[in-house]
Amino acid sequence: MNQSDSSLMDLPLEIHLSLLEYVPNELRAVNKYFYVLHNHSYKEKSLAWIAEDNYIWAVVKHSLCLYVKSLDPLRQHAREIIQETKEPGFNVPLCMTKYIADSWYIVYNALQYPGKIINMGWDKYTKSQDSNGSDSTSNFNSRPKERTLMQSLTALPVNFWSRRKDEPTPVNVWFYVKNAHVARYIPKIITEIGICNYGPKQIVASAGYINELITSEGIYCVNLGHLPRLYDEQIFEGTGTTHLPLELKAIDRTDSDVCINGDLVLLGYDFIPYQISKPWLLFRIEPVNSIEAIFNYSECSFSYQFAWSLACLQSEEKISFPRDTIIGHGLPYKPSKLIRIFVYKHPEQKQDLGQEIALPNWNTPYLRR
């Protein structure tokens, strides 16, 4: 330990905790003491928000542990700094449970923000695209004017908008585009967002000229704007409700077969602000066959199971969603380095590709303070 480290360690605990609020990522990397203290501070935040005896923990415990465990290729050695934990079990206290007690920073973020949503039907379209060979202009009269491409859930904290304040949350949709010709259909795929079995739904969609920006095959992330405010938070004050099931439905209004023959495949959604300083419209990633590096099936399963349980518990109406169909699918989560090619809202803004290459993997969990 050098002199500066020694001087830092001589400061009182209150100062250490205060410093963690300002520079958490930098300070927790200093030594084991600050890593453990950082973990403890997020345990306190989590349990101050959702008490240990709240039913929410029983709802999420199993799938949350599986999600955190799936991140071990990224952080197993760091997680194992926190010792004296036990394998997850029904009778194991929360604060002793492996993958929770050693990972409160990730747990806090997983509960504070809506998780990624994957379209579980994406692979059947991409696998059948060569055999189908259907013409997007054929059988016009027999095609429905509107079809649901996917419908899914993720959990949203009740106080989400009051906490975010001036930090709007984006809604991003992911597509596989087989060729530039089919990109013209993207603006006709709209997304209906609302709380499951509660209140009105709102619509978000891509810019009408988005097809002009897509010039080749690839996986594209398209910005649909911001998550709309869906309810008055005051309605839930004093009810003990901490989360609500957020429902997203993708609706195909293309009057074509491009979304079912593999030419244009909706992969899923996320709510991550990939670049805050420059408003962006879309980005393309390399290589094309990289969906398992974008969507962690364990994360998507946790988000869905959490929201599905909330919908069942909170609604008097019948829930049309099945139990989790995500768990057990997909490859183990191994985020590889993917390069993003951004298209910005303001054409004069350009991307620094050197910085993009130098940045750490962007497709690891997005963790806020």
UniProtKB/Swiss-Prot annotation:
Stretches assigned to the F-box domain: 8-45
- Pathway involvement of the protein, from the record: Protein modification; protein ubiquitination
Domain of life here?
Eukaryota
Q: Which GO terms describe its biological process?
A: protein ubiquitination; SCF-dependent proteasomal ubiquitin-dependent protein catabolic process
| UniProt KW keywords | Ubl conjugation, Ubl conjugation pathway
Q: Which GO terms describe its molecular function?
A: protein-macromolecule adaptor activity
Explain what induces or represses this protein's expression.
Expression is down-regulated by the presence of C2-compounds such as acetate.
Q: What happens when the gene is disrupted?
A: Leads to poor ubiquitination of CIT2 and accumulation of citrate in the cells.
Fill in the PTM field for this protein.
Answer: Monoubiquitinated by UBC4.
Q: Does the keyword Lipid metabolism apply?
A: no
Q: Which GO terms describe its cellular component?
A: SCF ubiquitin ligase complex
Query: What function does this protein fulfil?
Result: Substrate recognition component of the SKP1-CUL1-F-box protein E3 ubiquitin-protein ligase complex SCF(UCC1) which mediates the ubiquitination and subsequent proteasomal degradation of target proteins. The SCF(UCC1) complex acts as a metabolic switch for the glyoxylate cycle and regulates the level of CIT2 protein to maintain citrate homeostasis.
Quaternary state and partners of this protein? Component of the SCF(UCC1) E3 ubiquitin-protein ligase complex composed of CDC53, SKP1, RBX1 and UCC1. Interacts with CIT2.
**This protein's name:** F-box protein UCC1
Which species is this record about? Saccharomyces cerevisiae (strain ATCC 204508 / S288c) (Baker's yeast)
| Gene that produces this protein | UCC1
